Amino acid sequence: MSDSFLLEIRVRPNSSRNKVGGSAGDPPRLIVAVQAPAVDGKANAAVIKELANAFNVLVRDFTIVFGELGRDKRLLVNGDTQLLQARYDELLGEPKLL
C-alpha cells in the first residue's frame, strides 16, 4: 500500500553530528540534528537526506509543506503509511539529543 504520511519534526542545525531520534515540544516532534548550517537551504537538504536514511525511502519522496525557513517543520513523505508510522513512533521514543 502506497500513500502519504505527515512528519512533524524539530530541526537542530549546526549540530556536532547528524542524528534522527528523540522528541521535543508538545505535541512531540521528531528531532532531526544535522551538521549543516541553516543557510541557503543546506540544513533542509541535510534533513531530508537524514530522514530518507532513517525511514528507508528515497529523498524525492519528501516534500516540505510547512516551516521551510523555521526549525519546526511538516514534511509529507510518500510510502507505506503503516510502516512510516511505526518507524516514526520508534524514532520518537529514542533518547533525546543533547
Write out the residue ranges for each language-model feature.
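Contiguous, often N-terminal, cationic amphipathic patches that form binding interfaces
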Residues: M1-G41, A45-K49, V57-V59, T63-L69, ...
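The alpha-helix within a helix-turn-helix
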Residues: A52
